[in-house]
Design a protein with these regions (language model features):
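Structural preference for solvent-exposed beta-strand-turn elements
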Residues: 1-411
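Compositional signal for N-terminal targeting/processing segments
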Residues: 408-429
């Protein structure tokens, strides 16, 4: 049974000891899937995230003609062991100008950007398209770089949908790509550069995106390009919700909430969350935190002092306009939040319950669900949007300790609690 359209999180009222496992990193999983498809042999990805975004990537690879086997993971419901049979850098041919091969990328930015570069290594014509929000998200810097390399990209708006004409490898071709809007443009090119024979120069001042480019470079260096096994580490952004939950109740004796196997590779910028939470007087998305800064923003009204969050411009062009969304929904709950340019100042506030609009954004749903563990009356609209990266998030909240937090989650109809959810009803599919 699917998650209801509107749920209420009941605050925790007793100590709990928990160690939470979180699924694999989305960022690493989708990068690894591209590299595995380009490998010369069979690559087994262990601990890979199985969510909407990664399923989209797998389905696109299968549509292209790659053999991809997906097996359950015994340790984590939303992980999989994914085996990809690479063909030495060869990408199967696409369609024709009259009938391009259609690749649907949903609202998955990594799939949209990485596949745009990837299909250039094939022959034939490919059409990438997604949901309406994905058609609003930027692509221009990537398309410009692909054209510099000699590939034909047709898109009147330089966004999706786009028709890409594959031309195979182009040895010695050069391009430069800006990361001012998104690091995914550079990552797309760097993932395919070796097999494409490309020389890629990354330009632009954007410290908040640089860690993601560094992740790509480190992953390319460490990957088993001739076949083998590769372990995906847990997703630090997903782990931030449970570290935040632990802080909410730190004043209670015997209330440790830990995240199992917290990432230690330094590949994920959000692995720094434990160093920046609770947040200092000012905190930037420019090199300090990535998406987990949303967790810090959402919980900041409960801090003893105001916090200034800086360099949030990138949040505006993701799954939703996140700066607006955070300010709007926190204000509903009674928080004092001031937006100036790409900053938010969040002041200590006495919060109350409210119905939270998630804007179909998985991180909005999860951030405010954590707030609901402390603040009575938090109701989450469209909670199933967490399927994008963490389908069993609400199962983790509701499961009995030590594997979960033991929170009650209720369906809401006509403003009233109608029934408490149980078991698989917490899963977003």
């Amino acid at each position: 049974m699917a998650l209801p359209d509107l749920i209420e999180i009941v605050p925790l009222d007793k100590p709990v000891r928990a160690e939470i496992t979180v699924p694999g990193s989305k960022s690493i999983t989708n990068r690894a899937l591209i590299l595995a498809a380009l490998a010369d042999g069979e690559v087994m990805l262990e601990g890979a995230l199985w969510s909407e975004d990664t399923q989209i990537m797998v389905e696109c690879l299968q549509e292209l003609g790659f053999m991809v086997n997906v097996e359950p993971d015994a340790n984590e419901t939303c992980n999989r062991t994914i085996t990809v049979y690479g063909d030495g850098g060869r990408v199967p041919p696409g369609g024709t100008e009259q009938q391009p091969m259609e690749l649907f990328v949903g609202n998955a930015g990594t799939a949209a950007r990485f596949l745009a570069a990837f299909v250039c290594l094939g022959k034939g014509v490919y059409r990438l398209h997604g949901v309406p929000r994905m058609h609003e998200r930027p692509q221009a810097a990537l398309f410009k770089a692909l054209r510099e390399l000699g590939y034909r990209v047709e898109s009147p708006t330089d966004k999706l949908p786009a028709v890409i004409h594959g031309g195979g490898p182009k040895l010695g071709a050069k391009c430069q790509v800006s990361i001012e809007e998104s690091s995914q443009f550079a990552s797309a090119l760097l993932l395919c550069a070796k097999q494409g024979g490309w020389e890629v120069k990354v330009v632009g001042e954007n410290a908040e995106e640089s860690p993601y480019v560094a992740m790509t470079s480190k992953l390319v260096e460490a990957f088993p390009h001739r076949g083998g096994k590769f372990q995906i580490e847990p997703d630090a952004s997903s782990g931030s919700y449970f570290w935040g939950a632990g802080w909410l109740f730190q004043d209670r004796e015997n209330y440790p909430i830990n995240v199992a196997q917290w990432p230690g590779s330094s590949w994920q910028i959000d692995a720094q969350f434990t160093s920046y939470f609770p947040p200092p007087p000012s905190l930037s998305r420019n090199g300090q935190l990535g998406d987990s800064i949303m967790t810090a923003i959402t919980l900041s009204p409960l801090m003893p002092n105001k916090v200034l969050f800086l360099d949030l411009g990138r949040l505006r062009v993701q799954e939703c306009e996140r700066v607006f969304a955070l300010r709007t929904e926190l204000t509903k709950c009674g928080a004092k939040v001031v937006e100036e340019g790409d900053t938010l100042t969040v002041c200590p506030s006495k919060l109350h319950g409210a119905e939270i609009e998630t804007y179909n954004d998985h991180r909005m749903a999860m951030c405010f669900a954590v707030l609901g563990l402390k603040v009575p009356g938090i109701k989450i609209r469209n909670p199933a949007c967490v399927k994008k990266t963490f389908p069993n998030f609400f199962q983790k909240l509701a499961a009995a300790p030590p594997n979960g937090l033991g929170a009650e989650i209720w369906e809401i109809k006509d403003g009233q609690r109608t029934r408490k959810l149980s078991g698989d009803e917490h899963f977003a599919d």
